[in-house]
Amino acid sequence: MNKIIGIAFFTVSFSVGATVSAAGQAAQIDPLGYTISTPHPIDPAAGTTNPSALATQRQNPYLGSVPSGKATDEVIALSLPQAIALGLRYNLGLIESNQSSADGRAQRLRALSALLPELSLEGRQGVADQSLKEFGLRLPSIAGFPGLPATSGSFGFQDSRISMTQSIYNSLLRNRYQAERKAEQASALSAADARDVVVYAVGASYLQVVAAVARVETARAQLASARELDQQTEDRVSAQLSPEIDSLRAQVQKHTVEQQVTNASNDLEKAKLTLARITGLPIDQKFTATDAAEYREVTGLTEKSAIGHAREFRADMRSAAASVREAEYRLRSEKGQRLPALSFRADYGGAGVNVGAFSQVYTVGGQVSLPLYTGGRIRADIDQAQSNLTRRQAEYEDLEGRIVYDVRVAWLDMQASDSSVKVAESNRALADRALTQSQDRYLNGVANYLEVLRAEEAVTEAAENYIRSLYSFNVAKMALARAMGSAESEIQDFFGGK
């Protein structure tokens, strides 16, 4: 359940970050430009550890990791598969899930031990002086005989035995063991589901880095264009072909784009830091993302087949089913308290005043116990187990609906983003053509600089729309792979072997 809450926090926090980022970009862009409405994907950079790193770690451990190794001066090349492999090894959320699975295994072994024979070796050595009156020993009165003494007198003894106890039939212990088996199975499946969450988290963060790289490259290309146009405008003003205000506008535009390059570079470095935190890379390690963002359609898959695949392979679904079975066995276990319990005990060894005078001794016995009155304790235990079973059944039924919801939402986002990518790519080409024509018109004295400035803003918006749409599309594919319950295997198919 904690893991589900962590996933929800992960998605919501990233979504808010992407919305704020998109809003900030829109404030700098002409609303009449080439704006395309696209679904807002998650933004890993929004998963900050401020103001409390510990609070964030507890709420969503998938944003953290156990750093591996030491940073080097070398700039390493990091591909998407390599980043995912690091995340699957060092991500904090997966480490915690694996440890929970180990805890479940320990609980099962503890429950099993109660059903197995227990052997122990016991030894005693002591000196005693027993009261004969305490045992009720007395002799009839005989004239001239003083009778038995009050105590036996001091004597030593030694006793050494090996003993065995075995539960022959105990409904509580048997069903408790079955419950722990199912709990271990549910924990292992939960750890398997955590792997999909890590793949999704690392993939989305990696794509954020790739998108940030594209924004930096776009901003640098726009800066080169702005500098060239600034020089051309300055030459036209010097030749008295354009008013001085055109040169001033060109300089303002150049400085604006320079700041955009700075901001884009800053966002790139923060995205890299976020990826390093999720994957376990040393925070000071420099790296470059080698896999560029590409548009690749998902083929051979329908929404219906994706839902069927999710119902069959989602590990959290199977974990929830195992939790229901666990709750059923726990209910049987509590009801078993009302049944007789049969156990066996035996011991064998030697006893005497010393080792040389040992005599063979042994004890064999059985025990049957049946509670007659417990003050309502058993009834309370049964009610609590029944309540837990009802809760687990409700969670399982809810998860069935949530799985369909996850797949359909991811599918809708992928379709919408797919359309956005195609429109954005077309608009980007049109905006580039419009800018070229505006520059030609300006240099030929047919148009003023404002037309060129508007065309540059349109190119900027079209480029940003394409980057955002492509990022949304790829993250939607990541979300679909995670929703289907096979993120590790589907990533290769969805991203062309990357």
What are these regions (language model features)?
Residues 76-79, 118-194, 309, 313-399, ...:
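Small/polar-residue-enriched beta-strand and adjacent coil segments characteristic
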Residues 87-88, 140-148, 242, 246-253, ...:
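Amphipathic alpha-helical coiled-coil scaffold segments and their short linker/junction regions
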Residues 2-13, 20-48, 129, 465-498:
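Acidic, low-complexity, intrinsically disordered peripheral segments
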Residues 23-124, 130-131, 289-324, 371-372, ...:
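Bacterial Sec-pathway N-terminal export signals of envelope proteins
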Residues 96-111, 194, 198-217, 228, ...:
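Amphipathic alpha-helical coiled-coil segments
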Residues 3, 195-309, 413, 458-459:
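Periplasmic alpha-helical coiled-coil/stalk elements that build and connect Gram-negative outer-membrane
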